Amino acid sequence: MKVSVYVTLKNGVLDPQGKAIHHALEGLGFRGVNDVRVGKLIELDVDEAVAQAEIEEMCRKLLANMVIENFRIERQGQTTGHPAGQPA
């Protein structure tokens, strides 16, 4: 089963890479972009038996830095997000 994990910086955490992209877009003449935040996409291919809780644990222990990042998990058509990377 394919699982996508989206990792993004928490609100309030400075995003220098996003700021650099925003500045570059303006320099290239693109207008109307108010902000840019950069994150990462991690794709996993897991057995169907792998529980949601186990994937969340992978995120908390390795895939996301829980101090500064949030994560959101999508399993083939399902989306489960935890804004602070915490169980709902």
Residue ranges of model-derived segments:
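Long, contiguous binding/interaction regions
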Residues: 2-41, 47, 54-88
